[in-house]
């Protein structure tokens, strides 16, 4: 469940936050872990709608809310950097420090039961989700840049030297 309000320690938001800052000149690079991990990333707003539909259903049950698509961390980073016209390979570094010891390589959800029984399916595409998050973080980075230029914010990230 991703959105522009996802915590900055989660990989999707770490990437989009870095893209926003890099594109405005206040960050030099981003360091990530396993670029080959695959996830089923969907928009939190779509999942909230799914939860509401679950609550309206006549009988309690369990349903999976997912997109039915999987994308790697590398794909997410590439799409995010492409959105601002940059090559992710120029800005992404990989460190073993960020590899999880018990990494699940591949996660994919099947929402067919939710579609059949409660009429739910995801509305936001992967491309739209990434673009939404990057656009939000570009706006935030522009505000951060003004604060940095006026000595009101000390960067705690990979700041260009």
Predicted segments — roles?
Residues 1-5:
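Conserved catalytic-site region of short-chain dehydrogenase/reductase
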Residues 6-7, 11-161:
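C-terminal substrate-binding subdomain of Rossmann-fold SDR/epimerase-dehydratase oxidoreductases
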């Amino acid at each position: 469940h991703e959105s522009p309000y996802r915590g900055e320690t989660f990989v999707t938001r770490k990437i989009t936050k870095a893209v926003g800052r890099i594109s405005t000149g206040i960050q030099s690079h981003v360091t990530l872990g396993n670029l080959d991990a695959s996830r089923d990333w969907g928009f939190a707003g779509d999942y909230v709608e799914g939860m509401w539909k679950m609550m309206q259903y006549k009988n309690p049950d369990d349903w999976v809310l997912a997109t039915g698509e999987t994308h790697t961390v590398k794909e997410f980073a590439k799409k995010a950097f492409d959105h601002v016209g940059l090559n992710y390979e120029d800005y992404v570094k990989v460190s073993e420090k960020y590899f999880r010891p018990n990494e699940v390589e591949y996660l994919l959800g099947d929402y067919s039961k939710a579609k059949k029984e409660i009429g739910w399916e995801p509305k936001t595409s992967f491309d739209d989700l990434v673009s939404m998050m990057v656009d939000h973080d570009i706006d935030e980075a522009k505000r951060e840049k003004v604060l940095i230029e006026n000595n009101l914010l000390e960067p705690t990230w990979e700041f260009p030297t």
